Amino acid sequence: MLKLKAHLLTQGMHGMISQVEGLSRALNLSFKHHTVNLKSFWKFIPPKFTFISENLLTEKFICDSRVIISCGRKSVVHSIALKKRLKNKIFNIHIQDPKVSLKNFDLIICPEHDGLKGENVITTKGAIHYLRKNEINKKSKYLKLDKEGKKVVTVIIGGPNKYYDYSENQTNIIFNKIKTIFTPDKYKLIVIPSYRTPEDVVRKAFNAFSHNHLVIKDVDKNAYLASLSLADIIVVTCDSISMISEAAITEKPIYVANMMSVKNNKRFKYFFSQFKKLGIIRDLEDKVDLWSYNQLDEVNRLAPLIKERMKLNGII
């Protein structure tokens, strides 16, 4: 039997792609990605103030899929426009709070820290993603790392957003703390940047750690997966809920490297509190411990619930 097709709509960021692809895989859908771009003026307008039309898109496509999975602000208009045109021929799922009427979607998948509620809303702990433990372990030999009999610490660096600005001072504080805690006589570090990591922060990390440790200077998915496989301990900067959620598939200790927020980060505080209660994360401080927790695999927990909704709508 042919797999049901899904069209994945995002703005092309790693965190969004990870979520839509992870969900489509859990639902056993064949899929293709489409990066959404709105025409110049409309890309700056919030969805709730935007009229719904496919004419706002810089590029249209023929929708030959029964399922639309979207994530991110700019994809909202496209998903709703397709739903208006194709009606019950498609099942549209949006990941994250769309900031518009929930009635525009058949289903919304939203993290608990967003505080969204509705009959067509299913909530998750943290962000859903595409990572699987067996896929991570397959990449363990991708990085040629001499552990030298030491504990391996993977340090995953995010980048600035509206809550964290990655100022030189804050970056220095984090890097100095990591150097002080994870001394080279006991630990071997793998430092991994993300798509959002500024070039100057990557250079600073290289200068700070490359003498004794392995610093990956370019974004490399295989290196990222290998680093998760090799790690005894994982450190993730506090700016990325997606990367912390991805790391939680490993069941390995996750330390969050905190920095000062530039504005009230209520959603982040809720998320950190929730993951601490689940025993997944701890703040990066002076003491280093090893611990384990139950694997967090939200996307596969949700899959049967979503399939039931799709059956009710006659999609499967």
Where are these regions (language model features)?
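Catalytic donor nucleotide-activated moiety binding site of glycosyltransferases and closely related
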Residues: K186-D220
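Extreme N-terminal starter segment of soluble prokaryotic enzymes
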Residues: L2-H7
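A donor-sugar binding/catalytic signature common to diverse glycosyltransferases
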Residues: Q11-M13, Y224-N265
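Short, aromatic/basic amphipathic alpha-helical patches
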Residues: Q19-S24, A81-K83, L107, V201-S210, ...
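Conserved catalytic-core segment of nucleotide-activated headgroup transferases in glycan assembly
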Residues: P160-I192
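Leloir-type glycosyltransferase catalytic cores
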Residues: F272-I316
